[in-house]
């Protein structure tokens, strides 16, 4: 690393009597992670230069030289030939130094009316806005993949669980639509967070604004911001937008993690509801029979990492006085890693979902266990005039009897159901039509209302979700 330390004075070194040590340079430099902001730094600088020229703060010839130099720097960065220097601390001074080497005094004039404080805040917002747009697109792709799978399984019955115990039958498409709802809310949260990201800090300078006659609204328009940050102190020190994004990202990963947990369970041979395509799984170095769902497992693990970044950013900001502090340099790595993790995870899951093989027979067999239609029997009795609590008790008696007989409610005859219900002279409420409500199909079909698991409602929900996807 020492060989990378150029023997040039820092941009601010005229104030000091001795140079920084190599160790301190390495400790305080950020260029090797914030260089990913480079193209956005160029974008912001070009808009700033255009404003300076428009306002007569720099000459048009200087603006043209800056634009020409930045075009060359962009080419070098995209080609991977740009020489990043640790001695120049960060992405901003590296680009400025290269620009000055090419454009001379014009390059030195670029920083007129701005500080690295408002410059970096602008770069991060430009970058994060772009990444949010990418994430929103990936969320829509995942929602679309889930809808495609749900559409294939509007009649496939699977047990619904509470406490991981069989509760009531649902159609598998309905189960998948629950995740569509989660990822729809995630999309909305991302778009809402984008509103706070899309404000321009540039013009706040170090903390108090600038004495030059700048036009902040012009720069905001050039860069596609909705408006400007209204307080210069807040503009350079605010990282709420990054925290808010990380909170939204943590919820994305939480929903991915919940889905992953179910995929792992469903793929287990003891459950056997699904299979995941080989390209998303790994084997064992010792057990030749293994096919491990590593992608869902890793997604569960990476969720903790993203959650940790959120807590890290909250902790980073909680003790900072106004305005900018060097602490804020530590916002970038957790933010960058959060974006990378969410983007990679969503991209993989959108690719993985279409290849899921659903084992409908296994799902149905599981739904036939655990007395999944017990609630339907209770509802049947209520509809015939029995108070719900009495109906609940009667069905509980029947379930206990089935435990002893090792059979399901649907296996009992009408006579047996009457005898074991404990209803006494009200046992005749159990009629010859009772078995219709004890079937899986009858159970799911009866939930025929908005948000219910009836196949008809699930198909309508898919249509509505697709309309929301297109909107």
Curated annotation (Swiss-Prot):
Assigned keywords, A-Z: Amino-acid biosynthesis, Arginine biosynthesis, Cytoplasm, Lyase
E.C. designation(s): 4.3.2.1
Protein family membership: Belongs to the lyase 1 family. Argininosuccinate lyase subfamily.
Gene name linked to the record: argH
Protein name per the record: Argininosuccinate lyase
Xref: Pfam families: ASL_C2, Lyase_1
GO molecular function: argininosuccinate lyase activity
GO terms for cellular component: cytosol
């Amino acid at each position: 690393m020492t060989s990378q330390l150029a023997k040039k004075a820092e941009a601010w070194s005229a104030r000091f009597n001795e140079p920084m040590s190599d160790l301190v340079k390495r400790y305080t430099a950020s260029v090797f992670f914030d260089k990913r902001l480079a193209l956005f730094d160029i974008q912001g600088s070009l808009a700033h230069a255009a404003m300076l020229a428009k306002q007569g703060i720099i000459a048009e010839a200087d603006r043209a030289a800056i634009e020409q130099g930045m075009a060359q720097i962009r080419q070098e960065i995209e080609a991977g030939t740009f020489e990043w220097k640790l001695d120049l601390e960060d992405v901003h001074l590296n680009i400025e130094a290269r620009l000055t080497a090419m454009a001379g005094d014009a390059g030195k004039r670029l920083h007129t009316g701005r500080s690295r404080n408002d410059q970096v805040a602008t770069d991060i917002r430009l970058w994060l806005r772009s990444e949010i747009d990418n994430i929103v697109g990936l969320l829509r792709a995942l929602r679309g993949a889930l809808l495609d799978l749900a559409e294939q399984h509007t009649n496939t019955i699977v047990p619904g669980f509470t406490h991981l115990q069989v509760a009531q039958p649902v159609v598998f498409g309905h189960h998948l639509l629950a995740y569509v709802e989660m990822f729809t809310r995630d999309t909305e949260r991302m778009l809402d967070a984008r509103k706070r990201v899309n404000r321009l800090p540039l013009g706040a300078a170090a903390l108090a604004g600038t004495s030059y006659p700048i036009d902040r609204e012009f720069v905001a328009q050039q860069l596609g911001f909705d408006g400007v940050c209204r307080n210069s102190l807040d503009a350079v020190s605010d990282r709420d937008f990054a925290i808010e994004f990380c909170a939204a990202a943590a919820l994305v990963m939480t929903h991915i993690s919940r889905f992953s947990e179910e995929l792992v369970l469903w793929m287990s041979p003891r459950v056997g509801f699904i299979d995941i395509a080989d390209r998303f799984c790994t084997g064992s170095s010792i057990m030749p029979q293994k096919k491990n769902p590593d992608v869902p497992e890793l997604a569960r693990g990476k969720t903790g990492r993203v959650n940790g970044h959120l807590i890290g950013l909250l902790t980073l900001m909680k003790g900072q006085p106004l305005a900018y502090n060097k602490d804020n340099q530590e916002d970038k790595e957790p933010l960058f890693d959060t974006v990378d993790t969410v983007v990679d995870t969503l991209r993989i899951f959108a690719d993985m979902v279409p290849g899921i093989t659903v084992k409908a027979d296994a799902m149905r067999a599981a739904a036939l266990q655990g007395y999944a239609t017990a609630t339907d029997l209770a509802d049947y009795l209520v509809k015939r005039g029995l108070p719900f609590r009495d109906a609940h008790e009667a069905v509980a008696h029947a379930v206990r009897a089935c435990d002893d007989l090792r059979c399901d409610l649907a296996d009992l005859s009408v006579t047996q159901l009457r005898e074991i219900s404990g209803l006494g002279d009200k046992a005749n409420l159990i009629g010859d039509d009772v078995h219709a409500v004890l079937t899986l199909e009858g159970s799911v079909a009866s939930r025929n209302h908005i948000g219910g698991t009836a196949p008809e409602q699930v198909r309508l929900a898919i249509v509505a979700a697709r309309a929301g996807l297109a909107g």
